[in-house]
């Protein structure tokens, strides 16, 4: 298992590739990205650093055994395990294919489009429009490939997914607003599935998708450029003496002291993001405390404790019950792939957990299965339209609102919440269930 030190600068998406790979493989990596241990632009130009890494580039990795390697893809490969690299020659070749595709096809247009919005690069209108069209082509290509796949290569995350996600990261955060990305549902589903994996979240944190396409800011670009030195006037010059005293005071006020440490471009972009609004804030306060029910459900017997608590405290005016059924059972083949559909949906709805609960069950066997479940939502309507990020999967299901007082609803809730019962409306045996809580 690899172990060593990664030199980089903060929020370097190229370094994220190796760090996410290490989360999967168990490689032990120490990150040096800030003074006094590492100062980008200085440390990487010292003779000592250049002896180990002649190109002076970061990220750069130094193993505890003295092994040194630079270039982000090489580092990510080194700290990976066999599953990430591709467990067969064919899979390994496909992983390299997508890693190469990310560098050759995605990085150029992504940089041309995103960098001006961060103030890193000057804006060229025609180049930006060309980059947008190229990004559309790339997202469409991925969308077609992912139509019948959960991940880019095989049925599990590989370096292909890690690399392409990291390369697309700033596009999704900065410019791919909902109206632009909605044409690529399979790509969006895959991207959200990946970034919500625990190994991705450990490095990326909570990724906020773009709500409004960022534009080039000429002022920000000008501020990021090195300032030219202006010739000093001699002390006591005639022009200075002739200035009114009030004008001198105004000049002193205008010359505000510079902050001790300026934010880099990534930090500026993050700081400029609007604070997320609670999509349920408009609803009146409810007496039903969902978290308390979830604790009962997790720690107590479902039939004797959790269900009685649910019906005793359920607020039918503040909450609603829904039955959902997957629309395309004929497309379900291997049961583990069907389970991935459920798990992926849950991961993409992570921000909905405080206001929803669900029990979704896979019934049947390979090539003869179905998916259905019972959901609890805050409010009287389906929650998915409240956020574009929640709309990836829900149209793949039929939704029927349940009457909390009906005998049918009582039976459905009991059977789905306990995973026990006749399930007469299904006609197949329970294979396995998933809980969204």
UniProtKB/Swiss-Prot annotation:
> What are its GO biological-process terms?
response to virus; translational elongation
Give all residue intervals belonging to the GST C-terminal domain: 88-216
The stretch of residues making up the signal peptide is none
Looking at the record, the residues that make up the GST N-terminal domain are 2-87
Where is the Glycyl lysine isopeptide (Lys-Gly) (interchain with G-Cter in SUMO1) crosslink found in the sequence?
A: 253
- Modified-residue entries (N6-acetyllysine), positions: 147, 212, 401, 434
Positions bearing the Glycyl lysine isopeptide (Lys-Gly) (interchain with G-Cter in SUMO2) cross-link: 285
- Kindly state the subunit structure of this protein: EF-1 is composed of four subunits: alpha, beta, delta, and gamma.
Identification of the protein by name = Elongation factor 1-gamma
- Source gene? Eef1g
């Amino acid at each position: 298992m690899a172990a060593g030190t990664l030199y980089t600068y903060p929020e370097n998406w190229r370094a994220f590739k190796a760090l996410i790979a290490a989360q999967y493989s168990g490689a032990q990596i120490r990150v040096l990205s800030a003074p006094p241990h590492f100062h980008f632009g200085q440390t990487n130009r010292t003779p000592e650093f250049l002896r180990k890494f002649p190109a002076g580039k970061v990220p750069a990795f130094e193993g505890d055994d003295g092994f040194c390697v630079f270039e982000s893809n090489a580092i990510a490969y080194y700290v990976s395990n066999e599953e990430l690299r591709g467990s067969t020659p064919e899979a390994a070749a496909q992983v390299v294919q997508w890693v190469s595709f990310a560098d050759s096809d995605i990085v150029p247009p992504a940089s041309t489009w995103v960098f001006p919005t961060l103030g890193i690069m000057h804006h060229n209108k025609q180049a930006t429009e060309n980059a947008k069209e190229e990004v559309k082509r790339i997202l469409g290509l991925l969308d077609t490939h992912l139509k019948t796949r959960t991940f880019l290569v095989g049925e599990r995350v590989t370096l292909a997914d890690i690399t392409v996600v990291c390369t697309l990261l700033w596009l999704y955060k900065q410019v791919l607003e909902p109206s632009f990305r909605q044409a690529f549902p399979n790509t969006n589903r895959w991207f959200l599935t990946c970034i919500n994996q625990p190994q991705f979240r450990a490095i990326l944190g909570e990724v906020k998708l773009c709500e409004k396409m960022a534009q080039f800011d000429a002022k920000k670009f000008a501020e990021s450029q090195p300032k030219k030195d202006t010739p000093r006037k001699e002390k006591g010059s005639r022009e200075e003496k002739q200035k009114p005293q009030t004008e001198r005071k105004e000049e002193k006020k205008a010359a505000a002291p510079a902050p001790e440490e300026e934010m880099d471009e990534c930090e500026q972009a993050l700081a400029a993001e609007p604070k997320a609004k609670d999509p349920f804030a408009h609803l009146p306060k409810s007496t039903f405390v969902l978290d308390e029910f979830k604790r009962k459900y997790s720690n107590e017997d479902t039939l004797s404790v959790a269900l009685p608590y649910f019906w005793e405290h359920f607020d039918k005016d503040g909450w609603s019950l829904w039955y959902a059924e997957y629309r395309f059972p004929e497309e379900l083949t291997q049961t583990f792939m069907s389970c991935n559909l459920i798990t992926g949906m849950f991961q993409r709805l992570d921000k909905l957990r405080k206001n929803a609960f669900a029990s979704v069950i896979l019934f049947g066997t390979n090539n003869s299965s179905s998916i259905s479940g019972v959901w609890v939502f805050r409010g009287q309507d389906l929650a998915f339209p409240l956020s574009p990020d929640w709309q990836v999967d829900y149209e793949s299901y039929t939704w029927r609102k349940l009457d909390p007082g009906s005998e049918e609803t009582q039976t459905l809730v009991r059977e789905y919440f306990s995973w026990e019962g006749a399930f007469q409306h299904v006609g197949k045996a329970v294979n396995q269930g998933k809980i969204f809580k």
